[in-house]
Amino acid sequence: MTNEERNNLIMSKLSIYLNDYSDYINESMINNIKNEFGFTTLESYKIILTSILDITDKEIIHEFDKIVYELDKSVYEDNLYYKNINLKCISSNKWKFEYKSYKPYEAFVFNDLRCINDKLYPSIGYFKDEYKYPCVLENDREWMLITPNEIETMKVPISEATGNVLTYGLGLGYYAYMVSMKDNVESVTIVEKDKEIINLFNEYILPQFKNKSKIKIINDDAFNYFKKD
């Protein structure tokens, strides 16, 4: 099997599973494997998942060690934004806050796709217990989430931020908040074209920032601002 064929096989099967069956695996299934074979929870999970995906190639099955991860929800619940920013206050005719959740053992993408020696490795995670994450709805449709994927994929940009930071797009202000908490960041300029999002942020979220004085918001299109700058 070529690497391209391998990549297509893994990506296509996982895509279907994540879209349609992400919460199929449950604690009872895990315990059956653990009790019968003495495997760990993670080992049992990977056995069940590769069986559901009908993957029989032993080399690919072994590679799921680099694809599937058991996550510790306390790591994400200890995140500064998660702990300190209360989104429950958001409420209007258009905007509404609520908690969504991942069920125990529900599979989801928690980090970026990796490529090693021309082989693609998705980052699939699960929690052993229910994990709740904040979600803001716009006209009853999901607008912005703060999930483990958001937290993980922002780690490097946040760690590299220093001095006077410029970022395009406001969202729920996760990136802006996290970099504003750094001592080596002097200011955070955010370019956002949607005035309603800016108003939402200024009314409900910015007042909760410890270092709100570092924040400057420019109401403009990112491409227009880049050209002017």
Region spans (language model):
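N-terminal auxiliary segments of SAM/dcSAM-dependent transferases
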Residues: 1-127
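Class I SAM-dependent methyltransferase Rossmann-like catalytic core
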Residues: 2-7, 69-73, 78, 134-160
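Active-site and NAD+-binding cores of ADP-ribose-processing enzymes
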Residues: 119-123, 155, 215
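Conserved class I S-adenosyl-L-methionine
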Residues: 160-173
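Structural motif
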Residues: 165, 183-186
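Conserved SAM-binding loop of SAM-dependent methyltransferases across substrates and taxa
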Residues: 172-184
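Conserved SAM-binding motif I beta-strand of class I
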Residues: 187-192
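S-adenosyl-L-methionine
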Residues: 194-229
